[in-house]
Structure formats: C-alpha cells, structure tokens
C-alpha cells in the first residue's frame, strides 16, 4: 500500500455559520448539538479516492474578529479553502466578499477555494424565514451563491446541511478533486 497523500483543507467564514458542525458531521458522522466557538481545531480523515490513499486534514478556524491576527497561522501549506457562509445569514454572505476572499487572496492567492452555503436545511424553515423577514432579509439563493463564486473566482459554489448531511460528502469530494485533479501547484501561502 502506498503512502497517503496529505491534503490540508482549511475552513473559514464568520462565527456561527456552521464551520465546526460541517467538519464534525463529515469526520464523525454525527451532528454536534451545542455551539462552542472555535479558537482553532483540526481533524484527520483517512479515505481513498480512486486508487489513491488520502489523509485529509480538516482545519477549523475562528471567524470572530478577535482572532484575525491568529487565524492566518493555520493557512500555512493549505491545499484548498472552504469559504463558508450561512444561507440564512446575509451578513455572513456579504463578508465572504469583503473579508474572507481578500484574506485568502492576501495570504494564499494560488490556493483553490470552494464557496459553501451552509445550513441548507434552514432555507425553508418557517421560524428562520419569519426572523429574516422582520429584518427585511431573505435567505441567500443558489443564484446569488453562484454569482458570488464567479466574482471571487471560486472553483465552485455548493450548498449543504451538516444537520441533515444533505450534500455534505459532495462538498468534501469536490475539495479533494480540486487538489488531486486540477493541475497541482505547490501551496504558496505567505504567512508571517
């Protein structure tokens, strides 16, 4: 058996958009019920893609502003980024373009990115829709996600739910493909 190829996947986005749930649900096949803000955490998943053994390192990051100086330390040697926002949090969607995309481009301009709309299960939730309506907002549409992905030159836009696992595996499969099957460049992250 050949040695495993190591892929470092870093998940970024605003606090409370579901980054940790995304990773735990994928890595452990269970949805964590309690919200615990992340400072930094990582997980490893061993899998195969075709005839290749993969060691997928999943790096969780803190989205809160107070970690802006610390967070980029986790970007070193990243192979792919998942830039996440909550489908039912328009501010987190706007922050992809104003905060997260510029941050990735500053530190790791050559590393592929996938834009991920999280909490897909809440898009049609009556309680969530009522709260959004009270503030004059609506859930982010698939079309809006695709448009933003084009603007930030992400490889793809995907939507998923960590709670129901809808499209969850596909997000990570796409991330792995982006590293293995797109012309592989040496990770060029500049972290000082």
Swiss-Prot record:
Gene Ontology CC terms, in alphabetical order: cell leading edge; cell projection; cytoplasmic vesicle; cytoskeleton; cytosol; plasma membrane
Known partners and oligomeric status: Interacts with pakB.
Primary gene name: racC
Propeptide cleavage-removed residue intervals: 190-192
GO biological process, one term: vesicle transport along microtubule
GO function terms (MF aspect): GTP binding; GTPase activity; protein domain specific binding; protein kinase binding
Membrane topology, record value: Lipid-anchor
Protein name (Swiss-Prot/TrEMBL): Rho-related protein racC
